[in-house]
Structures are given as C-alpha cells and as structure tokens.
C-alpha cells in the first residue's frame, strides 16, 4: 500500500529582510493546504488529511532526522535563503539520493544570485548545472498540456497593481 502524499515545507534562516518578502513562511499554511486540496481534486494522487480533515503538511528543517522520509520538499522565497555547511550538506545528500525540491516565490536578479549561491553550496554548479527546461520537454505535457509559462504574481501584488504587471521586484524580475 502506498502512503498518502504529505506536503513538506522547509524552514530556513534568511540572511536579510526584503520588502514584501516573508522568507520560508510566505503564504504558510494556506498555500500548502490549498495545493494539497487541488492535488487531490485534479489528480489521482492520494493526499493525507489530519484529524480535523485538513490536508496533512509538515514543516521541517534540513537537519531534521525525518527529512529523508519525504520524497518532496518545498522552499518558498529562497531569494533570502542562507544555508550553513550542515544544511547545505544535508540538502545535497537529499537531492543526490533522489529527493525532489520545488522552490518558488522569489523575484529579480538579486534573489536569483542569492539562490544560485546557496544551492551551489549543496550541489556545485560544475557538477550540477542549473538550466531552463525547454518548452518542448515532455514534462510540460505529463498531466496537462502547458501552452505557455507565465510569471504568476502574488495576490497582494496583483491587488496593488490592479493586474497591470507581474513584476514585484522591478522591471527585470519578469525575466529572471
């Protein structure tokens, strides 16, 4: 029997504060719960629910003994991420052993540089280069056909801008 999918968010330290950013807890816990509900509604993935009938989700540190119990982990707003040596080593081990990491919700060239520096501690870029997945790749058609890859703004930015732009962090953040 397969166990139910549990959304696993990583708690991490930030190296600075950022206007509008909230670090690891950006949109927590509602985003985690909503994603799990939609996953159960739109796919055949079995999702776990707790005793209050809320989607099961956990918050872990990279140093947590249970990290390797979860094949999928999520990190939000990684443009302020700071990994110490032990955390970087654990993340690298997790990924090399087949763990899946989804990162989301960071904007602009400064945040991208910060992320690349930190992930480079876990997976050196010479051995593990980061690259864009070509639009023609089958991953864009596994469950649904993806016709375009838009930049999705935060709901707060959408409200503030009246839906005029997706850029939270300046004109170049739409490209990075």
Role assignments for model-derived ranges:
Residues 1-72, 76-79:
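Aromatic-Pro/Gly-enriched surface loop or interdomain linker
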Residues 1-3, 64-69, 94-96, 124, ...:
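Extracellular/periplasmic catalytic domains that process cell-envelope and extracellular macromolecules
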Residues 7, 67-113:
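Short alpha-beta junction capping motif
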Residues 12, 62-64, 69, 85, ...:
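Generic structural "secondary-structure junction" signal
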Residues 15-19, 110-176:
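An acidic, glycine-rich "communication" segment
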Residues 30-34, 38, 86, 90, ...:
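Extracytoplasmic/secreted proteins, especially bacterial periplasmic and envelope-associated proteins
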Residues 40, 99, 120-124:
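Hydrophobic/aromatic-lined pockets within catalytic cores
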Residues 45-61, 103-108, 127-136:
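Surface-exposed patches in mature extracellular/periplasmic domains of secreted proteins
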